[in-house]
Regions:
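Transmembrane alpha-helices and adjacent helix-loop boundaries
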Residues: 1-230
Length: 230
C-alpha cells in the first residue's frame, strides 16, 4: 500500500545520487560528443580507410546492447590496461580501475556511434555554397569553420544533442550491473531497506522528469540565442 510517510526520507536518500549521476552523464556526453564529432568529420571528408573503420565502428556499437558493452568493458578493460602497462614497463594495477571509469568508457563508446550521426546530419545540412562564398572573400579554413560553419552546425545539432544527453541519463541505470550507483540504483537500495519500492521508484521518476525538463529548456534557450546570432 502506498505510504506517504516514507516519501520525504526516500527523497533525501535518492537525492544523494543525483550529483554523481549528473557528473557521469556530463562526462559521457562530452567524451561521446567529441568522439562522435571526429567520426562525423572523417565521414564528411571521406578519408580513405578511416571512413570504413568508422562505419564498422558505428554498426558494431549501434547493434550491440549497451549492457553487453558494459560487461565487455568490465572484464576487458583491466586486461587491456595490464597488457599495455606490461608492454611499456609501467607499474599499473589494472585491477584497481574504478567501476565508474569503466561505465564512462563503455557508454561513451556506445553513445559516440549515435553522436556521429547527429554531427553527420548537422554537417550535411550546411549549404556548401556558403563555403565557396566565404573562401572567395578571403576567409581561411579556420575562419570559415569558426565564423560560418560551426554556428550553423551547432544550431542544427542542439535538439539531437539534448536527446543524446537524456539517452545517457537513462543508460546510466545499467551502471548498477557493475555496482555503480546512480539515481535508479539508489532508488533500489533505498527501497530494499524499507520495502517501499513504489514510493522510491516514483521519486526516481520525478528526478528524471525534472532533469529532462531542465535539459530541454536549456537546449531551447541556447538554440534560440544562437539562431538570433546566425
Amino acid at each position: 500500500m502506498f505510504d506517504t510517510e516514507v516519501l520525504l526520507p526516500d527523497f533525501w536518500s535518492i537525492l544523494d545520487a543525483v550529483p554523481v549521476t549528473l557528473l557521469m552523464a556530463v562526462t559521457v556526453f562530452i567524451c561521446s560528443t567529441l568522439l562522435g564529432g571526429l567520426f562525423a568529420y572523417i565521414e564528411h571528408q571521406r578519408i580513405p580507410l578511416l571512413r570504413q573503420l568508422v562505419m564498422v565502428y558505428k554498426i558494431a556499437f549501434k547493434g550491440v546492447p549497451m549492457v553487453v558493452v558494459i560487461f565487455l568493458a568490465y572484464y576487458g578493460l583491466p586486461s587491456a590496461l595490464h597488457f599495455f602497462a606490461t608492454l611499456f614497463n609501467a607499474e599499473v594495477n589494472a585491477h584497481s580501475l574504478p567501476n565508474w571509469v569503466i561505465i564512462i568508457v563503455a557508454l561513451s563508446a556506445c553513445v559516440a556511434a549515435f553522436q556521429a550521426e547527429v554531427w553527420k546530419g548537422a554537417l550535411n545540412s550546411f549549404d556548401s555554397g556558403q563555403s565557396d562564398a566565404a573562401l572567395s572573400l578571403g576567409y581561411s579554413g579556420g575562419q570559415l569553420f569558426r565564423r560560418v560553419m560551426f554556428p550553423q552546425i551547432i544550431v542544427a545539432a542542439i535538439p539531437d544533442l539534448a536527446n543524446a544527453f537524456m539517452v545517457i541519463m537513462k543508460a546510466l541505470s545499467l551502471a548498477f550491473a557493475i555496482e555503480v550507483v546512480d539515481i535508479f540504483a539508489q532508488a533500489q537500495l533505498t527501497a530494499a531497506l524499507n520495502f517501499y519500492y513504489l514510493e522510491a521508484f516514483l521519486i526516481a521518476v520525478v528526478f528524471y522528469m525534472v532533469i529532462a525538463w531542465v535539459v530541454t529548456k536549456f537546449a531551447d534557450m541556447i538554440e534560440a540565442r544562437l539562431r538570433v546570432r546566425t
